[in-house]
Amino acid sequence: MAAAAGNTLIIHPWNPTNKLIKEDDVMKIFDTMGIASKISIQDLSRYQKAFVHSSYVEATANQALSNHKKVLFSACPSDCLPFQDESYENLEFLGDRVIELCVVWYLYLRFPM
C-alpha cells in the first residue's frame, strides 16, 4: 500500500502476519516428516533465516527505492517484522552444493571409469 505526502510517495510494506518462525513451528514440520525425535535445534536463527525471502531484506528494499525519486518507507509498526539483514539465498546456495556433492560422489562410486 502507498500514500502520497506532497511530492513524496510513502510506501507501507508492513504486514503484521509476517513473523519469524518459532521453534514449535520447526518441530511441527519435522514431526510431519517423522524426524522430530532425531532433530535438536541448536541455532533457531538459521531456521528463521531459511524463511526470509530476498524481497524482505533491508538492502533489497532500499535498492528498490533508489530507482525512484522521493519514495520512502513508513515507519515499521511495533507489531510487524522489520526488514531482515539476510535472506535464505546463501543457505540455499550451500544446500545446493551439498546435494551436488552427494550426487557426484554417488555417480563416481556407481560408475567408476
Q: Where do the PLM segments sit?
A:
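Double-stranded RNA-binding/processing signature
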Residues: M1-M113
